[in-house]
From Swiss-Prot:
Family: Belongs to the MobB family.
Protein name per the record: Putative molybdopterin-guanine dinucleotide biosynthesis adapter protein
Organism: Methanocaldococcus jannaschii (strain ATCC 43067 / DSM 2661 / JAL-1 / JCM 10045 / NBRC 100440)
Signal peptide span: none
GO MF entries: 4 iron, 4 sulfur cluster binding; GTP binding; metal ion binding
KW Transcription (keyword) present: no
Residues the record lists as binding GTP: D11, S12, G13, K14, T15, D42, K43, K44, G45, Y86, N87, I88, D89
Entries under Gene3D superfamilies matching the protein: P-loop containing nucleotide triphosphate hydrolases (3.40.50.300)
Upper lineage: Archaea, Methanobacteriati, Methanobacteriota, Methanomada group, Methanococci
Residues that hold [4Fe-4S] cluster according to the record: C155, C158, C162, C179
Length: 234
């Protein structure tokens, strides 16, 4: 799963651009939209509202066509962590200007009458002025510049820290898949991502894959997730 942001001030065309991306891309894309408005998405008096007020940490409403999760506010890191469990190619983040900067996520900056120029920095992968863009150029930027979210791991295996790595990707001096987290193996210990060099990642991945494939009901797996409760290995 790779991420890229779309930022700009009000009426700069952010949502319209994302709509066009979704219409023209053949990739599986999730969208995160930030709003400063205090929107009440659940209605007072409904069953889900009552259950949430009664103390449910998460309330899930399932209909025949949609599923909605009601929970407390989540920061961008936690939202991305949840989305990583889905079979998604890209996540487009609308807004979250400060979080994008903090998490070193590249972005497309939308300008309207030059308004928004202050948002441009060394993580800006593309600048779009006054709605003028070619959608193929936008898709090319997304496919080449979106990165795997590192959460500021700063492991150094790529030869950079996370901030300078994204800067290098934006400038074309590095590829997004130079990051060790893009190699298909993610090791998480007690909630902390543990970086592994490609050689170690390949050994771990190949070993687990070979073991899993011997189990009944496993046929040509595409993704494998193993969670171990160490306290129960006694």
């Amino acid at each position: 799963m790779r991420v890229i942001g779309v930022i700009g001030y009000k009426d700069s065309g952010k949502t319209t651009l994302i709509e066009e991306i979704l219409k023209h891309s053949d990739k599986k894309i999730a969208v995160i939209k930030h709003t400063k408005e205090d929107v009440e998405v659940d209605k007072k008096g409904t069953d889900t509202y009552r259950l949430s007020n009664a103390g449910a940490k998460i309330t899930v409403l399932a209909t025949d066509s949609k599923t909605v999760f009601f929970t407390d506010r989540m920061d961008l890191e936690n939202i991305l962590s949840v989305l990583s469990d889905y079979n998604i190619d890209f996540v487009i983040i609308e807004g979250f200007k400060e979080a994008l900067k903090r998490l070193n996520i590249p972005k497309i900056v939308m300008l309207k009458d030059k308004d928004g120029s202050d948002l441009i920095d060394d993580h800006t992968a593309m600048i779009i002025e006054d709605y003028n863009y070619n959608i193929d150029d936008v898709l090319k930027v997304i496919y080449e510049k979106a990165v795997v979210p590192t959460m500021n791991l700063n492991c150094g295996h790529c030869g950079y820290n996370c901030r300078t790595f994204v800067k290098a990707v934006v400038k074309g001096e590095a590829r997004w898949d130079d990051c060790v987290l893009a190699k298909g193996i993610k090791i998480i210990v007690d909630g902390k991502i543990i970086p592994a060099v490609p050689f170690v990642s390949k050994i771990v991945g190949s070993t687990i894959k070979a073991m899993i494939e011997t189990l009944k009901g496993v046929d040509n797996p595409k993704t494998i997730k193993v969670e171990i409760d160490v306290s129960k290995l006694k």
